[in-house]
Amino acid sequence: MLFRSGREGFRKGMDLYFQRHDGQAVTCDDFLAAMADANGKDLTQFKNWYSQAGTPRVKVKEQYDATNKQYRLTLSQSCAPTPGQVEKKPFHIPLKVRLITAANNQAEQLLELTEPTQTWTFDRIDDRPVLSINRNFSAPIHIDFEQSEEDLLTLF
């Protein structure tokens, strides 16, 4: 929630939440309503975190085109069936990422995975980047992403 709203937005949401509900017995829906109202955002899909059991799994596929200096990142999400929930709706997964290259270090950005599969294209990437994903543990997920030992050393 913090990553989606930012510190200031999260604070606004908390202030509104306490203004409305201080001393009351409330629900997760009350909390989300305060966050949504304070920030003017639709958090309907975010409710899946509260209503669906299990931990989402995100599969990472990357492709670098040296000729066009373009990097494509495809993320696919799934969540295993649980008793009473065979079918799962896509989660709203906020993922902080950074592309690290020898030439430059791209700015950290927030990608919002809301569909079963989404692709992002990054232009003007001079070298094959090393992907740093789920920075600061931006989402409580499992990640399927095989990285070379060299790439892992770059991340340290």
Stretch-by-stretch model annotation:
Residues 8, 15-156:
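Non-catalytic accessory/interaction domains
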Residues 5:
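Inter-helical turn/loop segments and adjacent helix faces that build the functional surface
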